[in-house]
Amino acid sequence: RRSSSAASDVYKRQSLDITDKNLVIRVDMNVPLKDSEVLDATRIKACLPSIEHALSNNARILLISHLGRPSEGNFEEKFSLQPVAEYISNLFNEKCELINSLESKDIFNGKFNVQLLENIRFFEGEKSNSAKLGKILASLGDIYVFDAFGTAHREQASTHSAIEQANI
């Protein structure tokens, strides 16, 4: 089943064949941290149904999220998603690899089923809804999935431009 929307076609999770596909999933894992520990995992746990559905279909996953409000284009350790990657690793009892670069040859290299892109707000063009960044994000996998309802109101590269430019 699919319905038409202004930006692109919208597919229901159960209707799309994701078997053995590379999925880029925009999630909302903007969680509170203290001393590199996740204080409240509610938003991470909200993403579990999509992650589990993908893994049960032998899909590989690259998660994209933001954390806090870093200066765009600059790495700030206090906004790193490393603690979130560690939390996900513990949840699934397998390593969730943190990816630091969009050019990384490690993306979907077959070594890890779940990967997490470093804080999307570290990348130039996220907040300005850069079409260039959106195109790069959309091209990283076979399917771009939006599962970040809490960020749906933001017109940013990972929540808007990537969706417009994704094939599926």
Predicted regions and their residues:
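Positively charged, low-complexity/disordered segments
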Residues: R1-D9
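Active-site loop-to-helix "anion-binding N-cap" substructures in soluble metabolic enzymes
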Residues: S8-I168
